[in-house]
Each structure stands twice: as C-alpha cells, then as structure tokens.
Amino acid sequence: QPHPNEFVGLM
C-alpha cells in the first residue's frame, strides 16, 4: 500500500 507521503512526492 503506497503511503500518503509517497503520493505527495509525485506531486
């Protein structure tokens, strides 16, 4: 499961 922090990194 991808962490929310990783999602922010994509942004």
Curated annotation (Swiss-Prot):
Tissue note: Expressed by the skin glands.
Modification type Methionine amide: residues: 11
Matching InterPro entries: Tachy_Neuro_lke_CS, Tachykinin_dom
GO biological process: defense response; neuropeptide signaling pathway; tachykinin receptor signaling pathway
Record keywords: Amidation, Amphibian defense peptide, Neuropeptide, Pyrrolidone carboxylic acid, Secreted
Record bears the keyword Secreted: yes
Pyrrolidone carboxylic acid PTM positions: 1
Leader sequence segment: none
Compartment(s): Secreted
Recorded GO CC terms: extracellular region
Entry function: Tachykinins are active peptides which excite neurons, evoke behavioral responses, are potent vasodilators and secretagogues, and contract (directly or indirectly) many smooth muscles.
Family: Belongs to the tachykinin family.
Entry protein name: Kassinin-like peptide K-III
Lineage: Eukaryota, Metazoa, Chordata, Craniata, Vertebrata
